[in-house]
Amino acid sequence: MPAPHGGVLQDLVARDASKRDSLLSESQQLSQWTLTARQICDIELILNGGFSPLTGFLAQEDYNGVVHNSRLSDGTLWTMPITLDVPEQFANSVKPNQRIALLQDGTIPVAILTVKDIYKPDKSVEAEKVFRGDPEHPAINYLFNTAGDYYIGGALDAIQLPQHYDYPGLRKTPAQLRLEFQSRQWDRVVAFQTRNPMHRAHRELTVRAARETNAKVLIHPVVGLTKPGDIDHHTRVRVYQEIIKRYPNGIAFLSLLPLAMRMGGDREAVWHAIIRKNYGASHFIVGRDHAGPGSNSKGVDFYGPYDAQELVESYKNELDIDVVPFRMVTYLPDEDRYAPIDEIDTSKTRTLNISGTELRKRLRDGGEIPEWFSYPEVVKILRESNPPRPKQGFALVFNDDIKVDRDQLSIALLSTFLQFGGGRHYKIYDHNDKPEFLELISDFVQAGSGLIIPSTWSASNKVNSANVYTIGHAKDADIKLASTEETIFHIVQKVVLFLEDNHFIQF
């Protein structure tokens, strides 16, 4: 088992356990900062040692070293800036050497930060050096549109880890996981990083990796922040709990990682390797386009397919963790088995595969997902969380250019929908622009209802749902009406056809 990065596991909770009560009391008297969702993930991995050798949020000297050279000020390899970003108003309220209580959800103190410095980073440099500068990169979008303009650096005193109310038995800290491996006498462990559900191909490639390296398997999925649009972690964890049963007995272990991904490609892959070393893994599977967010709106990839593997491999000796390249496997239907695609002559051997896009389409449309691709229990979980279109909800928002009587159009649509039956709940919901209303719309849609919103709704694009559609004459309307379609009958007909084409209604 490798030593932690930097030589010592920085388990701050264990280090500060004897003074926890005094720290808790002190925190009530200090200025307070409520941590953001990303900061909650970061501080948990600082406090539990997952980010060893870090013992706090980066001060300016360390930050500059990481951004420009992928190294802390003492020369230690570290590729991702871990910063406490705050708005200018809060930054102006604190001074060096001041102590600040850091809270979860505004009420739960998790640590006290001793301020070393407050600085305003050059975000354009961070964006270019760390994430290659494309403004469409999700981390750059976060940097400029969500993160505070000032960073506060300093060391932490641990009060407690952030609280989680789900899967307590699966949330192992680095110290706990290392003890688990020792108790099982696992000195060689290959870690598998994922933010997606796992299917048969993933099981096959991880088993192959274990056999090739004479190691056991750590399934170590991210359950913090991942790429926008990813499947929620509750669905994924249920999948992992089922697929772990499909591994040869005693070969695999499941533990959850509370990481906030940046989708930082090659730099993030090195960061992931460091984290897995801290958790006790001796080997790490690095995938094709590892931790990459795909491509931008012009179809240009943010990272090359092998950038991550090459950068991690270049630091192999310094990382003290062996890189296992992700070998794509494909299904051979004539032999009913999976094999690495680089070993197959596809001109002579028949292969089958289902892409992520095709899988999402089959889930959406209720299409068949064969057992050679995924286990039945996994498919069942995915279908429960991703019902086909006829069982999904939707909301229809009237634009302000509709000229017919809105109340009558609402009644006509409701009456038309109700005659289809099918178990979907339909409701007319007049609007206001309060945030609570936006949340309610999203809840109704996710619960499978059909909503009709007759009043003009300028904030419709703020609803956190993919199935909210506008009706009107404007070019950007989802259901666009021609100038001649001014009767309620014509509009209802157009709406019904739209819903049928998108599989919400089946005849």
Curated annotation (Swiss-Prot):
<feature type="binding site">
    <location>
        <begin position="193"/>
        <end position="196"/>
    </location>
    <ligand>
        <name>ATP</name>
    </ligand>
</feature>
<dbReference type="InterPro" id="IPR027535">
    <property type="entry name" value="Sulf_adenylyltr_euk"/>
</dbReference>
<dbReference type="GO" id="GO:0019379">
    <property type="term" value="P:sulfate assimilation, phosphoadenylyl sulfate reduction by phosphoadenylyl-sulfate reductase (thioredoxin)"/>
</dbReference>
<feature type="binding site">
    <location>
        <position position="193"/>
    </location>
    <ligand>
        <name>sulfate</name>
    </ligand>
</feature>
<feature type="region of interest" description="Required for oligomerization; adenylyl-sulfate kinase-like">
    <location>
        <begin position="392"/>
        <end position="507"/>
    </location>
</feature>
<feature type="binding site">
    <location>
        <position position="329"/>
    </location>
    <ligand>
        <name>ATP</name>
    </ligand>
</feature>
<keyword id="KW-0198">Cysteine biosynthesis</keyword>
<feature type="binding site">
    <location>
        <begin position="287"/>
        <end position="290"/>
    </location>
    <ligand>
        <name>ATP</name>
    </ligand>
</feature>
<feature type="binding site">
    <location>
        <position position="195"/>
    </location>
    <ligand>
        <name>sulfate</name>
    </ligand>
</feature>
<dbReference type="Pfam" id="PF14306">
    <property type="entry name" value="PUA_2"/>
</dbReference>
<dbReference type="InterPro" id="IPR025980">
    <property type="entry name" value="ATP-Sase_PUA-like_dom"/>
</dbReference>
<dbReference type="Pfam" id="PF01747">
    <property type="entry name" value="ATP-sulfurylase"/>
</dbReference>
<dbReference type="GO" id="GO:0010134">
    <property type="term" value="P:sulfate assimilation via adenylyl sulfate reduction"/>
</dbReference>
<dbReference type="GO" id="GO:0004781">
    <property type="term" value="F:sulfate adenylyltransferase (ATP) activity"/>
</dbReference>
<feature type="site" description="Transition state stabilizer">
    <location>
        <position position="199"/>
    </location>
</feature>
<keyword id="KW-0548">Nucleotidyltransferase</keyword>
<keyword id="KW-0547">Nucleotide-binding</keyword>
<keyword id="KW-0963">Cytoplasm</keyword>
<dbReference type="InterPro" id="IPR024951">
    <property type="entry name" value="Sulfurylase_cat_dom"/>
</dbReference>
<comment type="subunit">
    <text>Homohexamer. Dimer of trimers.</text>
</comment>
<keyword id="KW-0486">Methionine biosynthesis</keyword>
<dbReference type="InterPro" id="IPR002650">
    <property type="entry name" value="Sulphate_adenylyltransferase"/>
</dbReference>
<dbReference type="InterPro" id="IPR015947">
    <property type="entry name" value="PUA-like_sf"/>
</dbReference>
<feature type="active site">
    <location>
        <position position="196"/>
    </location>
</feature>
<comment type="function">
    <text>Catalyzes the first intracellular reaction of sulfate assimilation, forming adenosine-5'-phosphosulfate (APS) from inorganic sulfate and ATP. Plays an important role in sulfate activation as a component of the biosynthesis pathway of sulfur-containing amino acids.</text>
</comment>
<comment type="similarity">
    <text>Belongs to the sulfate adenylyltransferase family.</text>
</comment>
<dbReference type="GO" id="GO:0005524">
    <property type="term" value="F:ATP binding"/>
</dbReference>
<feature type="region of interest" description="N-terminal">
    <location>
        <begin position="1"/>
        <end position="165"/>
    </location>
</feature>
<keyword id="KW-0067">ATP-binding</keyword>
<dbReference type="InterPro" id="IPR050512">
    <property type="entry name" value="Sulf_AdTrans/APS_kinase"/>
</dbReference>
<keyword id="KW-0028">Amino-acid biosynthesis</keyword>
<dbReference type="InterPro" id="IPR014729">
    <property type="entry name" value="Rossmann-like_a/b/a_fold"/>
</dbReference>
<protein>
    <recommendedName>
        <fullName>Sulfate adenylyltransferase</fullName>
        <ecNumber>2.7.7.4</ecNumber>
    </recommendedName>
</protein>
<feature type="active site">
    <location>
        <position position="195"/>
    </location>
</feature>
<comment type="pathway">
    <text>Sulfur metabolism; hydrogen sulfide biosynthesis; sulfite from sulfate: step 1/3.</text>
</comment>
<dbReference type="InterPro" id="IPR027417">
    <property type="entry name" value="P-loop_NTPase"/>
</dbReference>
<feature type="site" description="Induces change in substrate recognition on ATP binding">
    <location>
        <position position="326"/>
    </location>
</feature>
<dbReference type="GO" id="GO:0005737">
    <property type="term" value="C:cytoplasm"/>
</dbReference>
<dbReference type="GO" id="GO:0009086">
    <property type="term" value="P:methionine biosynthetic process"/>
</dbReference>
<feature type="active site">
    <location>
        <position position="194"/>
    </location>
</feature>
<feature type="region of interest" description="Catalytic">
    <location>
        <begin position="166"/>
        <end position="391"/>
    </location>
</feature>
<dbReference type="GO" id="GO:0019344">
    <property type="term" value="P:cysteine biosynthetic process"/>
</dbReference>
